[in-house]
Amino acid sequence: RFIISEIEVAVKLKADLPAGSDLAAAEAAIESIHPVIEMIGNPFVDRAAQSKDLLLGDLQSNGAIVVGPAVDNGIRAELATLPVSLSYDGAVAHSVEKGANWEDILKALSWLSTHAEGRGLGLKAGHVIITGARALLARGDAKEIEGQLGAWGKVNCTITG
């Protein structure tokens, strides 16, 4: 069961990003920027009994990623103060106006290039990399989920089960 929705900014790679890549190489490897919904699932019988570290979304409770259409690269200049909203069933449930700026995202990609390669999971052309939750909230029984990245673009999905 999907229990939390997170609205994120993601990048899609057009080229492999080898270990040790600097910021310029990271930027050159990016094909496009996308709005994304990360759906956090609950793999635990008793979620409340788990440690906070174990409840982190990435690689532990990630249930699905929904990737929206690419947005214009002009979004890069606004990322630090970008209004981002998460809507459930047509009503805004959470919104923020802050997040990682473009340089922060490039630094994270540079770091991730080495970290991923060290784990045998190099960053390859075509990979979509999420860059951290901006707006997030427990889903409850909501069926329609939408994420809005200011005036730049949106992503949505419908829960059917």
Where are these regions (language model features)?
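Catalytic-core "active-site belt" of small-molecule-metabolizing enzymes
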Residues: 1-103, 110, 138, 144, ...
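A conserved acidic, glycine/proline-rich C-terminal tail/linker
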Residues: 105-140
